[in-house]
Amino acid sequence: MDKSKRLFTKSKRSFRRRLPPIQSGDRIDYRNMSLISRFISEQGKILSRRVNRLTLKQQRLITIAIKQARILSSLPFLNNEKQFERSESTTKTTGLRTRNK
């Protein structure tokens, strides 16, 4: 092959199938916190189906389980750890008063 044709050939990489995030033995339940916490972002949002690589039925069951866990307060609605860190760092003391900036 000459150089002009060699530029357009694709390299053949091996395709490795990813493992499904939910195994067949896993029960999707609001009490299974180790399973549910894998599908929640750092901000406490439910991750999309495309990010999770779940089927439609699995995503629906995960969403229902997360909402049940939030209502029963075993899972927070929001994850406010970053907001607390930011508010503590912006507090300034001026004389006897403390001000939040």
Swiss-Prot record:
Domain of life the protein comes from: Eukaryota
Entry GO CC: chloroplast; mitochondrial small ribosomal subunit
SUPFAM superfamilies reported in the protein's UniProt record: Ribosomal protein S18 (SSF46911)
Broad class of the protein's primary localization: plastid
PROSITE patterns with a match to the protein in the record: RIBOSOMAL_S18 (PS00057)
Molecular functions (GO terms): small ribosomal subunit rRNA binding; structural constituent of ribosome
InterPro entries given in the database record: Ribosomal_bS18 (IPR001648), Ribosomal_bS18_CS (IPR018275), Ribosomal_bS18_sf (IPR036870)
Subcellular location: Plastid, Chloroplast
Signal peptide: none
Sorted UniProt keywords: Chloroplast, Plastid, Ribonucleoprotein, Ribosomal protein, RNA-binding, rRNA-binding
A biological process term (GO) from this entry: translation
Annotated family: Belongs to the bacterial ribosomal protein bS18 family.
Subunit description: Part of the 30S ribosomal subunit.
Protein name: Small ribosomal subunit protein bS18c
